[in-house]
UniProtKB/Swiss-Prot annotation:
Chief location bin: cytoplasm
This protein's UniProt keywords: Cytoplasm, Stress response
Name recorded for this polypeptide: Heat shock protein HspQ
Role played: Involved in the degradation of certain denaturated proteins, including DnaA, during heat shock stress.
Lineage: Bacteria, Pseudomonadati, Pseudomonadota, Gammaproteobacteria, Enterobacterales
Naturally occurring in which organism (per UniProt): Wigglesworthia glossinidia brevipalpis
Length: 105
């Protein structure tokens, strides 16, 4: 069984680039059809670890969807980011949806 460090709705930081992001989905292992060289290293263990769909912002504040390995992400301690309030709102919205049960009918 593969366990993941991060959960859906959690804010994270890219370890190398320092970008703030919000996790919107998790795969137990790499699941895209054709990995690019930037996404997969020569070490196959990276491919077998959890991968995350993460929303980040570009320099203009527009959302950027990324697919990142668990090894590329670190915990974000601060829950509030005045420079990127949209990501704070996205994180809060996702967490609220996960806590609130939905009626199907």
């Amino acid at each position: 069984m593969i366990s993941s460090k991060f959960g859906i709705g959690q804010q994270v930081r890219h370890k190398l680039l320092g970008y703030l992001g919000v996790i919107i989905d998790v795969d137990p292992e790499y699941s895209l059809e054709k990995p690019s060289l930037e996404e997969i290293s020569a070490d196959d263990s990276l491919r077998r670890s959890p991968w995350y769909y993460v929303v980040m912002e570009d320099e203009d504040g527009k959302p950027v969807h990324t697919y990142l390995a668990e090894a590329q992400l670190g915990y974000e301690i601060s829950p509030v980011h005045p420079e990127q309030p949209k990501l704070d709102e996205l994180s809060a919205s996702i967490k609220k949806q996960l806590k609130t049960p939905r009626l199907r009918n």
